[in-house]
A protein has these predicted regions:
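Lipid interaction determinants
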Residues: 18-166
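Bacterial N-terminal signal peptides
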Residues: 2-15
């Protein structure tokens, strides 16, 4: 009986994976994803984690082609005054280093297995109006990994892991 249960479970998992693979890349990206980790690899091979070991965040792909993305480091300084408009320069700097938020539109290239985001607005205003393309390295019903091949200022490439929100 155990063998039958194990075999049935394995077949169900394979069928689920095959069904997911038959959908378009865009259809598989749609929805809400929780940010798990970002790992940047510098040109010299050195790795860093710009949002720390336990970041928080979300990436949303809407069917009409809009996206919203927020990445926050696990440890962002609190503002002592409790007034977001009256932080110290050090508090503002710590917050800026540990967060990024942006929204805009996206397109998907099914053949290349990439998606390109056009930034309408960002907490890093230099990105506004720009395009950034990410490769889709892994995409299942539960997990999504993409790579940004060119992190700003020649810092290398970034690997980003997300888990689907449930």
């Amino acid at each position: 009986m155990k063998l039958v249960t194990v075999a049935a479970t394995a077949l169900a998992m394979l069928a689920s994976e095959a069904s997911a693979q038959s959908k378009s890349l865009k259809d598989r990206l749609l929805g809400t994803w929780h940010f798990v980790i970002a790992e940047v690899t510098a040109p010299d091979g050195q790795k860093s984690f710009p949002f720390g070991p336990k970041p928080r965040g979300i990436l949303i792909f809407a069917p009409e082609g809009d996206f919203a993305q927020i990445h926050i480091a696990g440890e962002v300084p609190k503002i002592a005054s409790s007034n977001r408009l009256a932080a110290t320069p050090e508090e503002y700097a710590g917050i800026m280093r540990g967060t990024i938020a942006q929204f805009g539109t996206y397109t998907v290239d099914e053949d290349k297995q990439t998606f390109t985001m056009k930034f309408t607005a960002s907490t890093f205003p230099n990105w506004e109006g720009t395009l950034q393309t990410r490769s889709v390295d892994k995409l299942t019903d539960e997990e999504f990994i993409n790579t940004n091949p060119q992190v700003g200022a020649g810092r290398g490439s970034a690997y980003n892991l997300y888990r689907r929100a449930r």
